Amino acid sequence: MTTLSPIEGMLQQLRGLAQTAAGTSSQAAAPAASGGFAGELQRSLSRINATQERAYGLSEAFELGKPGVALNDVMIELQKANVSFQTGVQVRNRLVQAYQEMMNMPV
């Protein structure tokens, strides 16, 4: 019975992540999101979003011709946003792969 406890804990975390991603988080999933893996994942997604918003804001400022905004700064910020987004996609892919492996484990 003790070997199932870690697996059940991981499944509960994945369910909490799925509910959070769907926007239907329950009160039980809220404590899990504040710390641990789920919390770190949420903070990472927030950082990716902030990087993209900063890059697109700088891009818009350049397009409007605001002084002090150079093209090379815009390109660097856009590449940073792209790299962070691609990293997030790879983390998601690994998470889905791990979930599928756990679901295919014999009990």
Swiss-Prot record:
One of the record's GO cellular component terms: bacterial-type flagellum basal body
Gene Ontology molecular function terms on file: cytoskeletal motor activity; structural molecule activity
Keyword Lyase: no
Cleavable signal peptide: none
Keyword Phosphoprotein: no
Regions that span the bilayer: none
Keywords (A to Z) from UniProt: Bacterial flagellum
GO biological process: bacterial-type flagellum-dependent cell motility
Chief localisation class: other
Subcellular location: Bacterial flagellum basal body
Record-stated family: Belongs to the FliE family.
NCBIfam families linked to this entry: fliE
Protein name per UniProt: Flagellar hook-basal body complex protein FliE
Gene name for this UniProt entry: fliE
